[in-house]
Amino acid sequence: GKYGTGLLFLPKESKLQDVILSILIEEIEKEGLTLMHLRKVPVNSSILGTDALSTEPDIRQIFVTGCNDQALLEKKLYLIRKRVEKKIRQTNAEIRQDFYIVSLSTRSIIYKGMLSSMQLRHYFPDLTNSYFTSGLALVHSRFSTNTFPTWSLAQPFRLLAHNGEINTVRGNRGWM
């Protein structure tokens, strides 16, 4: 499309958000693009468990425009994400801890969190809004077994959803 969109996990503190957003805007402008809109994603925090609620990030959605070539825009968004992540890694731990770019793309939007698959649509009202349509939806509901659960480590990842056990084709055929 002619725009890209992304979901961001941000710290709750507005001063920390301002630092992150200034880095993000700087990188967007370096690519000759424009941050068209910044939206607070509506959520229903009342359904969260204690651990998820205590670590819940502020979730924002961005819309980026300025390039009519979808493939080129996708590449620019990838570069922006990588540079922003690198700059944030070089900041203080307080900013790094609660920051994560969930998705930034012309092709997909990822909604995720420390939620069960049944909680997902109740937590994100966007997912039950009739104005939002999708040709494909992927839901991954397995919890991590070898890492401490966090919002950023929730499945799916940007390009992959799996249970941590990527086996060989031959091995999978043997089990069929």
Predicted regions and their residues:
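N-terminal segments that mediate ammonia production and transfer
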Residues: 1-176
